[in-house]
Amino acid sequence: GKTTTGVETFADQLATLRKIPFEQHLKSLTWLLKNYGRQKRRLKKMMNWYAKGDIQQLYKAAKKDAKGMRRILLYERNILMTNRFEEIAREQSLFCAVGAGHLAGGKGMLRLLKKAGFKVKPVQLG
Protein backbone atom coordinates (compact mmCIF):
# COMPACT_ATOMS: atom_id res chain seq x y z
CA GLY A 1 0.00 0.00 0.00
CA LYS A 2 2.96 2.40 -0.36
CA THR A 3 3.05 5.07 -3.02
CA THR A 4 6.04 4.98 -5.34
CA THR A 5 7.54 8.01 -6.97
CA GLY A 6 10.88 9.11 -8.29
CA VAL A 7 13.31 11.79 -7.26
CA GLU A 8 14.37 12.07 -10.89
CA THR A 9 12.06 11.69 -13.87
CA PHE A 10 12.78 10.40 -17.35
CA ALA A 11 12.33 13.98 -18.57
CA ASP A 12 15.00 15.11 -16.07
CA GLN A 13 17.41 12.47 -17.35
CA LEU A 14 16.71 13.40 -20.96
CA ALA A 15 17.30 17.08 -20.17
CA THR A 16 20.64 16.14 -18.61
CA LEU A 17 21.68 14.17 -21.69
CA ARG A 18 20.67 17.05 -23.95
CA LYS A 19 23.14 19.33 -22.16
CA ILE A 20 25.99 17.14 -23.39
CA PRO A 21 27.17 17.86 -26.95
CA PHE A 22 26.42 15.17 -29.53
CA GLU A 23 30.14 14.85 -30.29
CA GLN A 24 30.79 13.90 -26.66
CA HIS A 25 28.08 11.20 -26.77
CA LEU A 26 29.62 9.84 -29.97
CA LYS A 27 33.13 9.88 -28.49
CA SER A 28 31.94 8.03 -25.36
CA LEU A 29 30.05 5.38 -27.32
CA THR A 30 32.99 4.84 -29.67
CA TRP A 31 35.33 4.40 -26.70
CA LEU A 32 32.93 1.89 -25.08
CA LEU A 33 32.74 -0.16 -28.26
CA LYS A 34 36.52 -0.19 -28.69
CA ASN A 35 37.10 -1.06 -25.03
CA TYR A 36 34.23 -3.47 -24.41
CA GLY A 37 36.35 -6.14 -22.66
CA ARG A 38 38.01 -3.65 -20.33
CA GLN A 39 34.67 -2.02 -19.52
CA LYS A 40 33.07 -5.40 -18.80
CA ARG A 41 35.84 -6.17 -16.26
CA ARG A 42 35.43 -2.73 -14.74
CA LEU A 43 31.69 -3.22 -14.34
CA LYS A 44 32.35 -6.47 -12.46
CA LYS A 45 34.62 -4.55 -10.09
CA MET A 46 31.92 -1.94 -9.62
CA MET A 47 29.32 -4.61 -8.86
CA ASN A 48 31.66 -5.98 -6.17
CA TRP A 49 32.06 -2.52 -4.66
CA TYR A 50 28.29 -2.14 -4.69
CA ALA A 51 27.79 -5.52 -2.98
CA LYS A 52 30.32 -4.50 -0.30
CA GLY A 53 28.68 -1.10 0.17
CA ASP A 54 31.88 0.69 -0.87
CA ILE A 55 30.28 3.94 -1.99
CA GLN A 56 33.62 5.77 -1.95
CA GLN A 57 35.02 3.52 -4.70
CA LEU A 58 31.77 3.80 -6.68
CA TYR A 59 31.87 7.58 -6.34
CA LYS A 60 35.49 7.67 -7.56
CA ALA A 61 34.52 5.55 -10.56
CA ALA A 62 31.50 7.75 -11.38
CA LYS A 63 33.61 10.88 -10.99
CA LYS A 64 36.30 9.46 -13.30
CA ASP A 65 33.72 8.40 -15.89
CA ALA A 66 32.03 11.81 -15.84
CA LYS A 67 35.35 13.65 -16.33
CA GLY A 68 34.58 17.19 -17.49
CA MET A 69 30.85 16.58 -17.27
CA ARG A 70 30.74 16.03 -13.48
CA ARG A 71 28.71 19.16 -12.90
CA ILE A 72 26.05 18.03 -15.39
CA LEU A 73 26.05 14.28 -14.75
CA LEU A 74 26.56 14.23 -10.99
CA TYR A 75 26.42 17.50 -9.07
CA GLU A 76 23.37 19.15 -10.69
CA ARG A 77 21.44 15.88 -10.49
CA ASN A 78 22.45 15.39 -6.85
CA ILE A 79 20.96 18.78 -5.99
CA LEU A 80 17.77 18.08 -7.96
CA MET A 81 17.26 14.64 -6.40
CA THR A 82 18.07 15.90 -2.89
CA ASN A 83 15.56 18.74 -3.25
CA ARG A 84 12.87 16.32 -4.41
CA PHE A 85 13.74 13.96 -1.55
CA GLU A 86 13.31 16.83 0.93
CA GLU A 87 9.91 17.80 -0.53
CA ILE A 88 8.60 14.24 -0.24
CA ALA A 89 10.14 13.65 3.20
CA ARG A 90 8.31 16.69 4.59
CA GLU A 91 5.00 15.02 3.75
CA GLN A 92 5.66 11.33 4.46
CA SER A 93 8.28 8.75 5.36
CA LEU A 94 10.09 7.26 2.42
CA PHE A 95 12.73 4.89 1.16
CA CYS A 96 14.88 6.44 -1.54
CA ALA A 97 17.10 4.52 -3.95
CA VAL A 98 19.55 6.34 -6.22
CA GLY A 99 22.60 5.33 -8.18
CA ALA A 100 25.49 4.65 -5.80
CA GLY A 101 27.73 7.16 -7.58
CA HIS A 102 25.43 9.93 -6.34
CA LEU A 103 25.88 9.17 -2.64
CA ALA A 104 29.47 9.98 -1.61
CA GLY A 105 31.73 12.97 -2.06
CA GLY A 106 31.65 16.60 -1.06
CA LYS A 107 28.73 17.27 -3.41
CA GLY A 108 27.09 13.88 -2.90
CA MET A 109 23.55 13.32 -1.74
CA LEU A 110 24.58 12.00 1.68
CA ARG A 111 26.37 15.24 2.49
CA LEU A 112 23.55 17.35 1.03
CA LEU A 113 20.95 15.48 3.09
CA LYS A 114 23.00 15.78 6.29
CA LYS A 115 23.41 19.51 5.59
CA ALA A 116 19.62 19.75 5.31
CA GLY A 117 19.29 18.18 8.76
CA PHE A 118 18.49 14.57 7.86
CA LYS A 119 19.97 11.60 9.72
CA VAL A 120 21.49 9.29 7.16
CA LYS A 121 22.45 5.68 7.83
CA PRO A 122 23.22 2.71 5.59
CA VAL A 123 20.79 -0.19 5.34
CA GLN A 124 22.37 -3.64 5.36
CA LEU A 125 20.94 -5.89 2.67
CA GLY A 126 20.53 -9.64 3.07
PLM features: what roles do these ranges have?
Residues 71, 75-126:
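C-terminal soluble interaction/assembly domains
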Residues 1-90, 108:
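Hydrophobic, often amphipathic alpha-helical segments used for membrane interaction and targeting
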